[in-house]
Amino acid sequence: LGAKRAVIALKKHYEGAVAALSAAVKGTKVELYLSDSFYPAGDEQNLVFSITGKTVPTGGIPLDVGCVVSNVSTVLNIAHAMEGTPVTDKLVTVGGAVARPVTVSASIGTPLSKLLDAAGGAIGDCTFIVGGPLMGKLTDDLSQSVTKTTGGLLAIPRNHPIVAKKTTSPRDAVIARAACSQCSMCTQLCPRNAMGLNVQPHKAMRALASGNDTLIGDVNGIFSCCDCGLCTFFACNFGLKPNQAMQRAKAKLQSQGVKPVKEVKFEPDGGFANKRLPTNRLLYRLD
């Protein structure tokens, strides 16, 4: 790659890993970047901005600003491939309402039901999230297979609030019309907006509530949304679903053949670091 700088990023509370990596990189040019525990700390664009101060443009990738980001699983698999070991397994965390939360190495193509069995089964009447609690997708179909992008399987009681927030309803527009005050808290706490990408969920809510798509605001802002879900699961004081309004707007633009312009329109928010959401506060809200 011809990289001039190599950085390993991890959360500072992983003290064992920090100690091991500090010893491993001693005497090399590799740096450690120790992050506080906040959401979404592992987002690649957030990492690029936090470490380099550069914003990846709308529709772009880290390479557009001279960076390559690889997670630890990818780096491990690269090492396996260089050693001639075929990479046919995926590390998947099984958690939530299960008997024994576990991380397993599962072959690509393994039914999700087998992963649930490895965790001792679900406790009570549950639905499931493939992926993380905020960005993952709801499913009741555990016959689907592990793929190269599968990272987690969560068992969630059907009456848990997170299930309602991840469910799309035709009533969402009616509720938005009645309850959304346009306080813009969803926009103020948006990580991508803070990086200068002009993501404005409150305008997507305005368009949804009024039925007027011309009110969605900056089209590039719609395409810059990473669907982290922070606006829905934490920012909105009325329990509304701004991320779903953004999803609807993005899907409609894509169906019309609209494409983003690769650019960064605005300067990053000077208070970016102060807008980071501590993980423990998010978990408290999700529970």
What is each residue range found by the language model?
Residues F38-G42, N46-T55, D125-T187:
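Active-site gating/interface segments in enzymes
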Residues L1-E15, A179-S181, H202-M205:
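Phosphate-binding glycine-rich loops and their immediate beta-loop-alpha structural context
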Residues K11-H13, G95-A97, I129-T139, A249, ...:
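A glycine-rich phosphate-binding loop feature that marks nucleotide/adenosyl-phosphate handling sites
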Residues A3-A9, L32, T88-D89, I123-G131, ...:
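Flexible, glycine/charged-enriched surface loops at secondary-structure junctions
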Residues K4-A24, T28-S35, D117-G120, T147-K165, ...:
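Conduit-forming functional cores of very large proteins
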Residues I156-R177, T187, N193-R276, D287:
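Ferredoxin-type iron-sulfur electron-transfer modules in oxidoreductases and energy-metabolism complexes
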Residues L1-V7, V98-R100, M185-T187, L230-T232:
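Short, surface-exposed connector motifs at secondary-structure boundaries
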Residues V7-L112, A118-I123, G132-L134:
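Hydrophobic alpha-helical positions that pack around
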